[in-house]
Structures are given as C-alpha cells and as structure tokens.
C-alpha cells in the first residue's frame, strides 16, 4: 500500500535493526485519513470472505480494525490486556508475549460477543514474531468461530511470524512488508532501500 509506505518513510523512525517507531500516525497519534484508507484496503482484500466480526487486540489494533469494520459493515471485538471490573467471568483467555515490551500479557475476549457462527477477520498493527496473532487465533478458536484471515498493517517480514502463520495455511494480508531495518533504513519487500528521516 503505497500511501502507507510513504507514511512509514516520512514519519517512521528506525530505533534499531528490529524496532520501527510509528507513533506519529499509528500507535499513539492516529492519522484518521490514513486509517480510513487502511480500512478500505482491508475491506477490499477480504470482501469475498463473508466476515461477520473483526477481532483485534488493544490498543493499537483498534483504529485499523474499526475502519475495516465500518467498510465491511460488521462489529469489532478487541482482546483486553488488562483485567476489567466489568469483564470478570465468562472470558476466553490466552497468553501473548510482546516483543516490543518484552513481557507476557494475558489477553481475553468476552464469550458474550463471539461464537461458533462467526467468521472472523483478525487485524493488528504489527506482525513480528506472530505471538499476538497466535493469541488472537487461540481466542477465536476457543469460541468455535472460523478464521477468514489476518490483516496486518505493517509486517516485519525479516522476522518469522508471517512465515509461521502462512505455513499453517492462514491467509495473511500485510499492507506494508518490511524486509529490513538495517542501517537506519527501511527496506520494503520487493522495493528499493529508502532512508528514514
């Protein structure tokens, strides 16, 4: 997705060979026009899949998930990382290791909002080692729902998460695939190296 790649090049910051900071438009400050385009792109790619629900994880997956849901005319349910007083019982639970935060989180979805009749599209902001996607898949599978695919805003293709998911037969659609973050530069899969400002 060219507009997303341009945003990454212009506003993203490479912090190391495996960390890309995109808080200027995706996971702290949100660019709503970009999110709308991302939502349209996910909807276009998954329009034939009869999606009934989108599942994501708080908090950075919510904006792209909501925009895709708006385009597809379905609801979004987001997995919580923290316990809530209003959501104590009747939860599906999975453990997810966060590469960025270097910690394991228990994530949960209410059983009241997803069941075996749902055909789910999972959406998240990043795909690196695949732990968040696997955790979300576990929650969807616990509900007995089917997984139509996974939509990723930015995939770090140099890490093995995408490969692992695709080897399991999961359809993964990534809007920007990064081959490398070496030398303070973003290299997109099948693209030339571009220096990040």
UniProtKB/Swiss-Prot annotation:
* Residues binding xanthine: 20, 27, 156
Q: Where in the cell is it found?
A: Cytoplasm
Pfam families found in the cross-reference section: Pribosyltran
Q: Which CDD domains match?
A: PRTases_typeI
Its EC number is 2.4.2.22
Report whether Cell inner membrane shows up as a keyword of the record. no
GO-annotated molecular function: xanthine phosphoribosyltransferase activity
Q: Which keywords does UniProt give here?
A: Cytoplasm, Glycosyltransferase, Purine salvage, Transferase
The pathway where this protein functions is: Purine metabolism; XMP biosynthesis via salvage pathway; XMP from xanthine: step 1/1
What Gene Ontology terms describe where this protein resides (cellular component)?
A: cytoplasm
Signal peptide extent: none
List, in alphabetical order, the GO biological process terms annotated in this UniProt record.
Answer: purine ribonucleoside salvage; xanthine metabolic process; XMP salvage
Instruction: Provide the residue positions that the database annotates as binding 5-phospho-alpha-D-ribose 1-diphosphate.
Output: 128-132
Q: Which reaction does it catalyse?
A: XMP + diphosphate = xanthine + 5-phospho-alpha-D-ribose 1-diphosphate
Q: How does it assemble?
A: Homodimer.
Q: What is this protein's function? A: Converts the preformed base xanthine, a product of nucleic acid breakdown, to xanthosine 5'-monophosphate (XMP), so it can be reused for RNA or DNA synthesis.
Family of the protein in this entry: Belongs to the purine/pyrimidine phosphoribosyltransferase family. Xpt subfamily.
**What name does this protein carry?**
Xanthine phosphoribosyltransferase
Organism, per UniProt?
Answer: Bacillus anthracis
């Amino acid at each position: 997705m060219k507009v997303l790649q341009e945003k990454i090049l212009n506003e993203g910051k490479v912090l190391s060979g495996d960390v890309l900071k995109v808080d200027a438009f995706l996971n702290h400050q949100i660019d709503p026009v970009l999110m709308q385009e991302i939502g349209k792109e996910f909807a276009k790619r998954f329009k034939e899949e009869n999606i009934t629900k989108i599942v994501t994880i708080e908090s950075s997956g919510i904006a792209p998930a909501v925009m895709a849901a708006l385009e597809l005319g379905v609801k979004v349910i987001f997995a919580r990382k923290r316990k809530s007083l209003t959501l104590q019982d009747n939860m599906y639970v999975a453990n997810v290791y966060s590469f960025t935060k270097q910690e394991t989180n228990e994530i949960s979805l209410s059983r009241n909002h997803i069941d075996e009749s749902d055909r789910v599209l999972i959406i998240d902001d990043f795909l690196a080692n695949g732990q968040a996607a696997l955790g979300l898949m576990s929650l969807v599978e616990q509900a007995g729902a089917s997984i139509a695919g996974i939509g990723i805003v930015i995939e770090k293709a140099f890490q093995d998460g995408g490969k692992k998911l695709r080897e399991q037969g999961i359809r993964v659609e990534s809007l920007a695939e990064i081959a490398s973050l070496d030398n303070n530069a973003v290299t997109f899969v099948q693209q030339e190296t571009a220096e990040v400002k």
